[in-house]
Amino acid sequence: MPRRPVILCVDDELNGLEGRKMLLEESGCKVLVATGGAEALQLFASHPVDLVLLDYHMPAMNGDVVAEHMKAGQPDVPIALLSADDGLPESALRWVDAFVSKSESPANLLQIVEYLLDLHLLFAPLNGLTGGRGRRAA
């Protein structure tokens, strides 16, 4: 039986966080949750993660800063930045692999998650050979 993908969901808005957690668990994923950047970095460092869904606007540490720290340690793990604000600065997208509007339908979110997980699985063997340089963040 294949291992369930592990997704780290990070959002300071609990309703959205719980909704995404339920959706992803129903689709067969194992979901870790964090309500802030420091907690997310701790979970990311201590658990194997296949994908990160990361809110941009959070107190203390915005998502782009969290993504930069994550990519410094594990550049091969895909990160999707979430926001209700479609007007993020281009610099906010530097360390992420995708941007997802919080207004996306659950079906579209699942398609994006599946695509990013497929990319992760595709590049994981290559990253093992190249020391994590098989692909780079956007």
Regions found by a protein language model. Name each.
Residues 35-39, 61-66:
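Acidic catalytic/metal-coordinating carboxylates
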Residues 33-51:
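Acidic, metal-coordinating helix/loop segments flanking the phosphotransfer/catalytic sites
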Residues 42, 64-75:
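Short amphipathic alpha-helix used as the core "switch/output" element in two-component signaling
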Residues 58:
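Receiver (REC) domain active-site loop signature in two-component systems and cognate sites
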Residues 11, 55:
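Active-site residues of response regulator receiver
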Residues 120-138:
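CheY-like receiver
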